[in-house]
């Protein structure tokens, strides 16, 4: 067993790669399960040894990839507190938030050969939870859209303009009015703890969604 800092072996990059791959699958699956887009644009794939639904719509896929490409430098520096998938109604008011709380320890005690296989087993459990989450959530109104929010640590927020990694895809400071839900219902879905990562997933659901 070896103790490493986050700087060793570009370890921040390894964790960021794992997280971005997982979040891409998770976002696609959330959009499918919560019926934000027609089921016809999704195709069944296999990720983490389980079947998942992934979009085959080029523009949607590009948006998700661009978003995570911008998140990746923040994950590498351990500057991300939460990644939030917000589902919005026709009036652009949030009806649901899928919140991924992420914690990365500064010191890592790991053996390299067991690292990824163990973490992927834990991430598989998240995917399975997302795939059945509609059983504990109310139906959403028709015509919903989505956006992705990133909650960063304070120091990172001051440097956001310096880490724009895709031209014409800038970070925009979220307006609290646009993302606030009054007294939402909180539904915990999954928690994981590993040597390289702690993550909690829960949903905040608006009490009255309309139709």
From Swiss-Prot:
One BP term from GO: negative regulation of epithelial to mesenchymal transition
SUPFAM superfamilies: The spindle assembly checkpoint protein mad2
Effect of residue 63 to A: Alters interaction with REV3L. Loss of interaction with REV3L
Cell compartments where the protein resides: Nucleus; Cytoplasm, Cytoskeleton, Spindle; Cytoplasm; Chromosome
Pfam families tied to this protein: HORMA
Effect of residue 200 to A: Significantly prevents interaction with REV1; no effect on interaction with REV3L
Keyword 4Fe-4S in annotation: no
InterPro entries: HORMA_dom, HORMA_dom_sf, Mad2-like
Predominant localisation class: nucleus
Stretches for region Mediates interaction with ipaB: 150-211
Top-level taxonomic group: Eukaryota
Coiled-coil parts of chain: none
GO CC annotation: chromatin; chromosome; cytoplasm; nucleoplasm; nucleus; site of double-strand break; spindle; zeta DNA polymerase complex
Mediates interaction with REV1 and REV3L and homodimerization: annotated segments: 21-155
Keywords: Cell cycle, Cell division, Chromosome, Cytoplasm, Cytoskeleton, Disease variant, DNA damage, DNA repair, Fanconi anemia, Mitosis, Nucleus, Transcription, Transcription regulation
Gene3D superfamilies tied to this protein: HORMA domain
GO molecular function terms attached to this record: JUN kinase binding; RNA polymerase II-specific DNA-binding transcription factor binding; transcription corepressor activity
Keyword Ion transport belongs to the record: no
UniProt tissue specificity: Ubiquitously expressed.
Domain HORMA: 13-203
Assembly mode: Homooligomer. Heterodimer with REV3L. This dimer forms the minimal DNA polymerase zeta complex (Pol-zeta2), with REV3L bearing DNA polymerase catalytic activity, although its activity is very low in this context. Component of the tetrameric Pol-zeta complex (Pol-zeta4), which consists of REV3L, MAD2L2, POLD2 and POLD3; Pol-zeta4 is the fully active form of DNA polymerase zeta. Component of the shieldin complex, consisting of SHLD1, SHLD2, SHLD3 and MAD2L2/REV7.
Function: Adapter protein able to interact with different proteins and involved in different biological processes. Mediates the interaction between the error-prone DNA polymerase zeta catalytic subunit REV3L and the inserter polymerase REV1, thereby mediating the second polymerase switching in translesion DNA synthesis. Translesion DNA synthesis releases the replication blockade of replicative polymerases, stalled in presence of DNA lesions. Component of the shieldin complex, which plays an important role in repair of DNA double-stranded breaks (DSBs).
Involvement in disease: Fanconi anemia, complementation group V: A disorder affecting all bone marrow elements and resulting in anemia, leukopenia and thrombopenia. It is associated with cardiac, renal and limb malformations, dermal pigmentary changes, and a predisposition to the development of malignancies. At the cellular level it is associated with hypersensitivity to DNA-damaging agents, chromosomal instability (increased chromosome breakage) and defective DNA repair.
Protein's name according to its UniProt entry: Mitotic spindle assembly checkpoint protein MAD2B
Gene designation: MAD2L2
